[in-house]
Each structure stands twice: as C-alpha cells, then as structure tokens.
From Swiss-Prot:
Organism (species): Ateles geoffroyi (Black-handed spider monkey)
CDD domains: Wnt_Wnt2 (cd19345)
Annotated GO MF terms: cytokine activity; frizzled binding
Protein name (database record): Protein Wnt-2
First and last residue of the signal peptide: 1-25
Lineage: Eukaryota, Metazoa, Chordata, Craniata, Vertebrata
GO biological process: animal organ development; canonical Wnt signaling pathway; cell fate commitment; neuron differentiation
Pfam family for this entry, one: wnt
Lipidation (O-palmitoleoyl serine): 212
Localization (cell): Secreted, Extracellular space, Extracellular matrix
Length: 360
C-alpha cells in the first residue's frame, strides 16, 4: 500500500470517532446503578473528571439525582405515551435510550431539557427536605415582603431553587462544555431551557394568621409546582421546537427556515428531522410500533391508522376486573363490587419483512 493511502487508513478510525455523535449524558444511568454513592460514581461510564469529583464530593446530591432519573423518565413516557416513540428506556444501556438520541432531533431536544429540569427539581426538593448537607431552605427569603395583597412575613421553608439550578448547571453541562461541536451547543441550549422551566412554576404559598381567620398576618414561602407542570410546559415547547443550523463562526444558531422566529432561551432547538419510528431500525435506534396498543376511535397520534403506520392491527378480546356498583355508606366509606369487563384491545401488526421480537 502506498504511503498516502496508508496514512488515510491510519487516520480513518480517529476520523470516524470524531464524526460519530455520542449520547453524552451518561449520568442518566445513575438511576439504574443503585448502591452507595461510591459505587454509583465509579460505575457510571462516561462521566468526565469534574462530574466524578462532584459525585464523590456530594454523595447526598447524587442520591437525589439518581432518584430523580426515575421521575423525569416517567414524565417523559407520560408525555409521549400516545406517540410512536414513547420515550422507552433500555435495560443495561448506559445511555438509557440507545441510539435513538444520537440524532439531533426534537426528541433529543425534549429528553435533554426534561432531564436537566428533573435534576433541578430533585436537588431542590432534597434541599428542602434536609437531605443535602450543602444546602437548605432559600436563605434569601427572610424578613418581610410585599405583594398585591399587602405585607407578609417570609416563613416556612422556601425551595432553594437557585442552588438546584447552580448545581445542575455544573454537573449536567460539564461534558457538553468540553465539546465545541454543534451537538454540544444544542444540548447546552436545551439543558438551560429545561432548568429555566422549573423556576417558571415556582409559586408563592401563604398561611393566614389572625382572629377568626381574618388573615391580618400572613406567612409566605416559595414552593415548586408539581413536576407535571414542567413536563406539560416542555411538551408544548417540544411541539413548537425550532429547527436551526450553526452560524458561520460556529458559536451559535440561526433558524433553518427564515420564515420562523429566532429561538429564545426558553425554546427547544434541534438540527435533524426525526425518523418516522414505524419499524425497528438498529441504525436509528427505533424499536418500531409493532405490538403497540392503538386507539381505534381516536383521530390523533394514538389512532390505529397513525400508530400502526398503515400496517393494520390485530384485535384481541380480554376481560379485566373493575370496581362497579359503588355506594356511599354512612359514615364514611365507599363500598364497591368487583365486576368483570370485556373489551377489545387493538395492537399494531408487525411489518411482514421485519425482524420483530418483542413489543415496545
């Protein structure tokens, strides 16, 4: 082999490594490791040095993050429950989602945003519950305050969301900040949008004090809303996500279609169109929709026509136990009977030439 060709072959593996995108949020696997924080820190593959340092230095925060993974993945699956890609996770895969998030798609944008939001939520909650040594209630919410109803005293335990955001930024963004490529910038943007979304739903709660509930005195605190509000908000952002391209100097984005508005810090951004997720595809990581339950009467994404990609569906007759004939008995109980309900369940057919093994 001549010298130029030999040089190309020597460089090819490195070139492929550089060109192949990587799902960089390996910390997602923290929810599956279990055990002590040291076991967690040492057994999650792909953490960069600053993440491992934070992991060893703050084991109580890592426990909160690990528990939070279960919460935000469940929220992701709730939001995508009626779609072809249903945010399904893979056992024994440190990226949790497999190759599907290698594509810089809307789905990737949502997952990075909801995971970042989940870290903020989990850490902030752990702080308020006294489970983290390095933080507690928000120290800035002391003394008196004023709102449209008048003067009040700060009391109770205001959620220290600024600590949650600061720690989430340092931990979650660490690997992305080491990269200068387009995908790293996309992830950083969506991570930040996710963090901001939790703070958006911080609400003031108050308790009245005074004679006969006169509310002459009020004690107030700031509390995070249920995580479902954040999930619903990011779902709306997913549906309105903006496709972008890198600008010429490689430092930011510009819209792919000039007819659309420039993305704000609250918007989700993506580079690539999504696959249709209809069939199992090892290249894209799609598990397909064969075996998925569909809704025969729906006209939405969960309809048998859309979910099954026009392949048709199978119908099975099943029975299930339900509560029926419920009556209120004084005082104070509701008593029900157990009844069998017969219903039809419709599941998507597999492609005739597909290598299908298990439903998603």
């Amino acid at each position: 082999m001549n010298s130029p060709l030999r040089g190309i072959w020597l460089w090819l593996p490195l070139l492929l490594t550089w060109l192949t995108p990587e799902v960089s949020s390996s910390w997602w696997y923290m929810g599956a490791t279990g055990g002590s924080s040291r076991v967690m820190c040492d057994n999650v593959p792909g953490l960069v040095s600053s993440q491992r340092q934070l992991c060893h230095r703050h084991p109580d925060v890592m426990r909160a993050i690990g528990l939070g993974v279960t919460e935000w993945t469940a929220e992701c699956q709730y939001q995508f429950r009626q779609h072809r890609w249903n945010c399904n996770t893979l056992d024994r895969d440190h990226s949790l989602f497999g190759r599907v998030l290698l594509r810089s798609s809307r789905e990737s944008a949502f997952v990075y945003a909801i995971s970042s939001a989940g870290v903020v939520f989990a850490i902030t909650r752990a702080c308020s519950q006294g489970e983290v040594k390095s933080c507690s209630c928000d120290p800035k919410k002391m003394g008196s305050g004023k709102d449209s109803k008048g003067v009040f005293d700060w009391g109770g335990c205001s959620d220290n969301i600024d600590y949650g955001i600061k720690f989430a930024r340092a931990f979650v963004d660490a690997k992305e900040r080491k990269g200068k490529d387009a995908r790293a910038l996309m992830n950083l943007h969506n991570n930040r949008a996710g963090r901001k979304s939790v703070k958006r739903f911080l609400k003031q709660e108050c308790k009245c004090h005074g004679v006969s509930g006169s509310c002459s005195l009020r004690t107030c605190w700031l509390a995070m809303a249920d995580f479902r509000k954040t999930g619903d908000y990011l779902w709306r952002k997913y549906n309105g996500a903006i496709q972008v391209v890198m600008n010429q100097d490689g430092t930011g984005f510009t819209v792919a279609n000039e007819r659309f508005k420039k993305p704000t810090k609250n918007d989700l951004v993506y580079f690539e169109n999504s696959p249709d997720y209809c069939i199992r595809d090892r290249e894209t990581g799609s598990l397909g929709t064969a075996g998925r339950v569909c809704n025969l009467t729906s006209r939405g994404m969960d309809s048998c026509e859309v979910m099954c990609c026009g392949r048709g569906y199978d119908t099975s007759h099943v029975t299930r136990m339900i509560k029926c004939g419920c009556k209120f008995h004084w005082c104070c109980a509701v008593r029900c009977q157990d009844c069998l309900e017969a219903l039809d369940v419709h599941t998507c057919k597999a492609p005739k030439n597909a290598d299908w093994t298990t439903p998603t």
